[in-house]
Amino acid sequence: MPRFKPYNYDQDAMVVINYRHQLQPGTFEYAVHYLIEHKLDLSVFYPRYSNEDTGRRAYDPAILLKIILFAYSKGITSSREMQWCCETNIIFKALSCDTVPHFTTLAKFVSSHSDEIEELFEQVLLVCHDQGLLGNELFAIDGCKMPSN
């Protein structure tokens, strides 16, 4: 009978991950991160927050935008799926600094800032296209409603 190396699913592992190292220059996710952190003006989002003195700390719009824009680039439009990606996908974890916004937080942010997000997404895509990071793939977000049977 052949002999195989043993394995055990009931073992724990401590893996050190530096999230900044997961965002490699020359990739779309790095471009999204860099543009949101260093180039785009996000002040348009700030007036809706009124928690300077009291109230719970809010998620930084930069973090929410990174999650949403990267998800859109992958064809993910469901806020529940975005939350799941933040829990399980290393690139989403890196973009969100290992935070996991609730799907209702993501959905509310998108619905209350849809025009601003659309404008920023277009800017990000144009810059990434100029840098050759898109690979000439089709990006489409379809809001078409279909009747169900």
Each predicted region: which residue ranges?
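Generic, well-ordered alpha-helical scaffold segments in large soluble proteins
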Residues: 31-35, 70, 85, 89, ...
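Charged, often Cys/His-bearing segments associated with DNA-binding zinc-finger transcription factors
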Residues: 1-38
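Hydrophobic alpha-helical scaffolding
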Residues: 18-22, 57, 114
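Basic, short loop/linker segments at the boundary and entry of helix-turn-helix/winged-helix-like folds
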Residues: 25-69
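Active-site- or DNA-interface-adjacent structural scaffold in DNA-acting proteins
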Residues: 96-149
